[in-house]
């Protein structure tokens, strides 16, 4: 194996492929990154990683002078490529080692037994395409509410529901719930699919595939690729594909938790509310709520109690309906506010002890944007 490749293209592709490598692999070869030249007659360079859960494959242009394959430490190769000077990179296999030359810098890497490396799973059949920037933004909003407790694996995922030309992303950790909708171009107009995808992998993948205009989503309900979801995008003059195993289990039926009517609807400047919550929550003890009192044209935030430190701040708000006082975990509240992209946030309530629904709006008078909704459970207030 021998090839010559642009330094930036190689460094970017290696970093992308190595990002999902396990920190403590169950088998040593799973820490490796597979480097192949001209696989299946493609004429280029292919970098692959796989840990039996998530696979990554990057194809990139290169001047190949000898075909072959080698398995080297993925993290080490990523560190080396990141530090190389801005000159063409030459890599070749010399016996049991891989030689890497860039300018006057020379590295020799020990290879791992390539024959022990598992075969990567095939991509399921393409289901449709979505704008890459829109998809990355939507996923970033949805994963905010995903659980992080591996004892409840179902809640660490994002449920993707596909109906025709619409994709819904749902996530919950039992204390908050996110729902994001976006349009896409399905391969079949009657597409109706659902999948539970690990939130961390989905967020990382969506964010890493924004170089090209579109991302292809590949999801199979049966046959080849069943139990997998695949994503494909373009970057660095080549193609990047990733697959991940779907989570098992039944995602809770959460759509009905969004109420259809509200007794109080408040609108507040998002930036002002974020700053106020950050200030007031400085005195809130661990796991205690920040109180929010909505009345007429004012929102008053309070935190702290008794002989401990206390804080209070009032900001302007447009409040329609009954006055209401409730409280929320300040970090969960900030997570939702930060995820909303609009300048104004709408908070809608049925009663103080029930969840609030948050959404964005372009102005105090504009229609709420319900493409993204964030439902947040209240916390019991300290008397």
Where do the protein language model's features map onto the residues?
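Structural preference for solvent-exposed beta-strand-turn elements
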Residues: 1-383
């Amino acid at each position: 194996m021998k090839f010559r490749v642009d330094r930036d293209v190689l460094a970017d592709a290696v970093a992308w492929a190595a990002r999902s490598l396990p920190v403590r692999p169950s088998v040593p070869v799973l820490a490796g990154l597979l480097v192949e030249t001209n696989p299946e007659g493609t004429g280029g360079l292919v970098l692959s990683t796989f840990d039996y859960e998530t696979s990554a494959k990057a194809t990139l242009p290169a001047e190949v002078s000898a075909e072959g394959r080698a398995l080297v430490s993925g993290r080490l190769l990523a560190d080396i490529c990141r530090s190389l000077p801005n000159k063409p990179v030459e890599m070749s296999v010399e016996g049991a080692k891989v030689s890497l030359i860039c300018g006057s810098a020379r590295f020799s890497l020990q290879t791992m037994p390539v024959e022990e490396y598992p075969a990567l799973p095939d991509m399921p059949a393409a289901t449709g395409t979505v704008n890459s920037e829109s998809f990355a933004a939507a996923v970033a909003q949805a994963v905010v509410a995903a659980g992080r407790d591996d004892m409840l694996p179902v809640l660490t995922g994002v449920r993707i529901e596909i109906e025709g030309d619409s994709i819904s992303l749902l996530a919950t950790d039992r204390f908050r719930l996110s729902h994001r909708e976006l349009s896409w171009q399905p391969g079949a107009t009657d597409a109706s699919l659902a999948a539970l995808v690990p939130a961390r992998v989905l967020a990382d993948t969506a964010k890493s595939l924004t170089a090209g205009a579109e991302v292809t989503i590949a999801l199979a309900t049966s046959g080849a690729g069943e139990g997998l979801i695949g994503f494909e995008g373009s970057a660095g003059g080549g193609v990047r594909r990733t697959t991940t195993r779907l989570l098992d289990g039944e995602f809770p039926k959460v759509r009905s938790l969004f109420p259809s009517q509200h007794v109080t609807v408040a609108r507040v400047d998002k930036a002002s509310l974020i700053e106020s919550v950050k200030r007031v929550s400085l005195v809130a003890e661990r796991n205690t709520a920040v109180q929010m009192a909505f009345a007429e044209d004012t929102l008053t935030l309070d935190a702290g109690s008794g002989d401990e430190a206390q804080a209070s701040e009032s900001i302007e708000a447009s409040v329609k309906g009954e006055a209401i006082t409730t409280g929320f975990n300040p970090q969960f509240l900030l997570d939702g506010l930060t995820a909303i992209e609009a300048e104004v946030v709408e908070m809608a309530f049925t009663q103080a002890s029930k969840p609030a629904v948050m959404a964005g709006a372009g102005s105090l008078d504009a229609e709420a944007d319900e493409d993204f909704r964030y439902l947040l459970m209240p916390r019991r207030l300290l008397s």
